[in-house]
Swiss-Prot record:
Zn(2+) binds at C113, C116, C131, C134. This is NAD-capped RNA hydrolase NudC. It holds the Pfam family NUDIX. mRNA decapping enzyme that specifically removes the nicotinamide adenine dinucleotide (NAD) cap from a subset of mRNAs by hydrolyzing the diphosphate linkage to produce nicotinamide mononucleotide (NMN) and 5' monophosphate mRNA. The NAD-cap is present at the 5'-end of some mRNAs and stabilizes RNA against 5'-processing. Has preference for mRNAs with a 5'-end purine. Catalyzes the hydrolysis of a broad range of dinucleotide pyrophosphates. Homodimer. It comes from the Bacteria. It catalyses: a 5'-end NAD(+)-phospho-ribonucleoside in mRNA + H2O = a 5'-end phospho-adenosine-phospho-ribonucleoside in mRNA + beta-nicotinamide D-ribonucleotide + 2 H(+); NAD(+) + H2O = beta-nicotinamide D-ribonucleotide + AMP + 2 H(+); NADH + H2O = reduced beta-nicotinamide D-ribonucleotide + AMP + 2 H(+). A divalent metal cation 1 binds at A177, E197, E238. Substrate binds at R83, Y139, Q211, P212, W213, P214, F215, P216, H217, S218. Divalent metal cations. Mg(2+) or Mn(2+). The gene is nudC. A divalent metal cation 3 binds at E193, E197, E238. A divalent metal cation 2 binds at E193.
Amino acid sequence: MNRFPTERPADFVDDLKVPAAPDALFFIVREGKLLLSDAGELPSGHSLAGQAVIALGRLGERPVFALPLTGEAPAGAQLVGLRQCFGVLPDGLFGLAGLAVQLVDFQRSHQFCGACGTPMRPGEGDRARRCPSCGLRVYPRVAPAIIVLISRGTGPDTEFLLLRGPRQAPDVFTTLAGFVEPSETLEAAVHREVGEEVGVKVRQVQYRFSQPWPFPHSLMLAFTAEYAGGDIVPQPGEVEEAQWFTVSDLPQLPPTFTASRRLLDDALATLRLSGDFATT
């Protein structure tokens, strides 16, 4: 399976003690945005002296760091939203950009202990923040979320249940997704979210793959499921429109770097391999 661009590159090694070097790679972040040159390149040649630098690791032999930008973007550079960096950054760097944005935000939002208010300190040997007063330790947040492709029928009669949310483009439809609740299994989350968002029931829930999703700090767990009954009832405020689409007449789909798109592409590829249906 091809790697998602939101993943860490295969040749990246996590290293909290990586030393500085002249060829070091820097992800400079402010409010979830990356500092890029006007040519769309990452900054280089920065000094680490006196800066709240976060060691990420090594990309091959090249040290990689993240650090917050406290002022405005300098001349010849601009702050670019993480989503807008897709296709701009070289291959393999988008996933590290997501890691940098998440860790800078974690450091910013955990400057003080949530239990006693004492200034937090970096953990030793891990990504945690620790309180020197009461001993509280907190780690970078990862919010698990399920995403599921619901289908019915076989061969050329296969249909997918797709929806459009209030924050999506009006002509783009995607698969259903939602966060996992405390004490809930992933499979139970699939059944609950399907019932809440579109009002139908499903069966044959099967795990497919996962994808890190740094918007802002999710891990997508992808599933497929078969329709088991019920009428579509869109959840008010969460789902603008939901309907069945035949595989020969699909709407505009999400970008290729999303878990939703991979679920759909994999399902279509399976239909092609079955030999009884050709998709274009």
